[in-house]
Amino acid sequence: LFMALLHPRSGQVLVDGEDIVNYEPADLADKIGYVFQNPDLQILEDTVFDEVAYGPRAKKLTAETIKKQVAAALAATGLAELADAYPRLLSFGQKRRLGVASALALNPRTLILDEITNGQDAIEKERMMRYLQTLNEDKGITIVLISHDMDVVRRYAKRAIVLKDGCLVYDGTPTELFGGAHDVEEWGLRRPTAAALAGRFGFTAATPEEFCSKLQRKGAEG
């Protein structure tokens, strides 16, 4: 729906306040960047620089503009020193960031990221999410993150939407989602680590901080 490959049967999908059905495909592509779940599917060129420059060149931007936008995208994702590297030799996490850089080079207002933290270790995952948080807070880019990693959702998302069998079953904050009032397992989701551990100790907690505080209180009470 976001990419206008399908049109909604009811309601609207708005991008920059405009219904997507009113956009020409090329104009919508300027507004939205998409990063695949499998980063290898987006690798088309022989250097990191050329990979990120692929989109701007397809739009026939000037060489100076391409150089500027690619440099900014590589800097934003921590890949500036790898501009001449062969993309397929990058680590999995670096390939993820390369996909984000390629999308950023077109200056989108919205980024759609499909399972962007899958297959990453804790350090790479943290680094990636901090990059995305910076893009959102400093550049005002809307991040739409498709994820089954509930720890990432709990920690970084401002709004959580849960779909089950194609239907909307939840739309609200992560704190409310994992606060104990909703049976997220019934929706096929795993509770964040803090919430799952809290359940074993007989109380609820939406964050690690809340879990530690309640556990200490429980211990003090004997």
At which residue positions do the language-model features occur?
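Helix-to-loop junction immediately C-terminal to a conserved catalytic motif
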Residues: M3
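Conserved ABC transporter NBD signature motif
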Residues: G11-D19, L28
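Conserved ABC ATPase "signature" region
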Residues: E64-L82
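Conserved ABC ATPase signature
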Residues: Y86-L90, Q94
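Conserved catalytic motifs of ABC-family nucleotide-binding domains
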Residues: N107
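Catalytic Walker B motif of ABC-type/P-loop ATPase nucleotide-binding domains
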Residues: L111-D114
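Conserved ABC ATPase "signature" C-loop
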Residues: D165-G166
